[in-house]
Amino acid sequence: DLYRKDPIERPVSDFSTESLDKIFNVNRGEDSGYADDDIKPLSIKVSGFGGQGVLSAGLTISQAACAEGKHVSWYPSYGPEQRGGKSNCSVVISNETIGTPVVDDIDILIALNKPSLEQFSKDVKVGGTILYDSKIGEFETDKDINVIAMPCVDIAEEHGNARTANTALLGALSELSNVLKRESYENAIREMFVSKPKVIDVNIAVLKAGAEWIKNNS
């Protein structure tokens, strides 16, 4: 049948416990977190459309925190497995055991699209930070919040790959919060893309560029 089309087979994301344990090098039953009195619990929400690297950005933050021995949770929420669907994840970093991975009060919101910015901005704590893609346009709030519009896509394109805009935002995050070292983000990127050395180099360059942009513009 010339008109018959086989169904498209899409790759299925694996967020099983076994898969995540492998990513984070976690041994079940072993409490690898440690108490650090200088760390206050930090709640981060990363949000955008499917295909913008929202979940991988959250995983990178989580891996960086895990590598430093901190308590961390990563909680994904996503629509259909296709580009354009809504996607967000919550990351909590703490100096003690985390009771719930659900984030209702956000310290730092990273938004890659307008719907996410509008949806989650109301949940950002007073004194918190909103970091978003400047291509979204103007955004105003009556709350006492630090709002930063960052040209993350432009930064990514300058390094040859617009899809690394999420990494530019992570670079900004590494400067805005001193909870994690920049080197930990870099090492997490190396772990995430261990089989793709060219991708590693580009992402680390974009990470550094994002951090530099924040230094010069905040």
Task: Give a label for each model feature.
Residues 2-218:
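Active-site cofactor/cluster-binding pocket
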